[in-house]
Regions:
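Chalcogenol-based redox active-site neighborhoods
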Residues: 1-174
Length: 174
């Protein structure tokens, strides 16, 4: 497995990222992760292919229990219209993710990859030292092609929201 150094850090401490980078124009790897639908006590499985034909935004975060990740997740609620499926992805337990989304009255789904590092490796966002995901944003069109990919190096910084919104509004996604 590819390991990348010098591409992620927090407060000057370098982190190793596992997996190769994905780029616009590439097919997005399918995934299977858990979500906890509101009002249900048992997690269910979600895959990227479940929403084929729709534009998807993957908001990949370290943990929903950190201020930067919370701010970022709230921001996507404000910026992205209902015609785009937003998934917040982390290695948090599905119960923690759903609790936070419920408190915030968020409309989008949270996906948990806590059982496996497969998503992190496939999307090139697994932080080896933390066993968490690197902050990143992916916009995937209805055909499953990546139209925007941003890997945020400084884990204390938010992504470039406008670049992702521009990719969504470019009209070439449907």
């Amino acid at each position: 497995m590819i390991e990348r150094s010098g591409e992620a850090f927090e407060e000057g401490i370098q982190l190793t990222v596992v997996g190769g980078k994905l780029h616009p124009g590439q097919k997005a790897p399918d995934f299977h992760m858990e979500t906890l639908p509101p009002g249900q006590g048992t997690p269910s499985s979600v895959s990227l292919s479940d929403t084929a034909g729709k534009v998807r935004l993957l908001n990949v975060i370290n943990s929903i229990d950190t201020p930067v990740c919370q701010c970022e997740t709230r921001r996507w609620e404000e910026l992205v219209g209902e015609d785009v499926i937003v998934y917040t992805v982390s290695m948090d337990l599905p119960f923690a993710l759903q609790r936070w989304l419920g408190q915030e009255k968020a409309r989008h789904q949270a996906l948990s990859s806590h059982k496996s590092e497969e998503f992190g490796q496939a999307y090139g966002v697994l932080l080896k030292e933390w066993r968490l995901l690197q902050r990143a944003v992916f916009v995937i069109d209805g055909e499953g092609v990546i139209r925007h990919a941003e890997y945020v190096a400084d884990q204390m910084k938010e992504p470039d929201y406008q670049a992702a919104v521009h990719a969504i509004k470019s009209g070439s996604l449907r």
